[in-house]
Swiss-Prot record:
One of its GO terms (cellular component) is mitochondrion. InterPro entries: BolA, BolA-like_sf, BolA/IbaG_stress_morph_reg. Belongs to the BolA/IbaG family. Residues 89-108 are annotated as: Disordered. Pfam families: BolA (PF01722). This is Putative bolA-like protein K11H12.1.
């Protein structure tokens, strides 16, 4: 398990995801620095969760599980969440692809 960002929101997301899914692998990365937000903001995240809990579930079902787990944060502090929820049997150690460059914000 690894966490690429260690701010308080990233730590909370990591704790909640770990408790809910007992993942074989977990990455929580704050990508707010790629967006037009104040320095130090924790609003944009990507997560990679590899868990037996996702076995036999379609992608949309896996995403719903993650969204439900983080519902409070999504309703309050987290603006955007990129989810990579992988069943343990389908994970071969791959890392998430880099996120595309932000194209929005303040009329851009």
């Amino acid at each position: 398990m690894s966490t690429l960002s260690e701010g308080p929101v990233a730590r909370l997301l990591k704790e909640k995801l770990f408790a809910a899914f007992q993942p074989k692998h977990l990455e929580v990365e704050c990508e707010s620095h790629l967006h037009n937000v104040p320095k130090g903001a924790e609003k944009h995240f990507r997560v990679q969760v590899v868990s037996d809990e996702f076995e036999g579930k379609r992608v949309i079902e896996r995403h719903r599980l993650v969204n439900t787990c983080l519902a409070k944060e999504l309703a309050t502090t987290v603006h955007a969440l990129r989810i990579d929820a992988i069943p343990t049997s389908k994970w071969d150690g791959q890392k998430q692809e880099d996120s595309p460059t932000c194209r929005g914000g303040f009329g851009k």
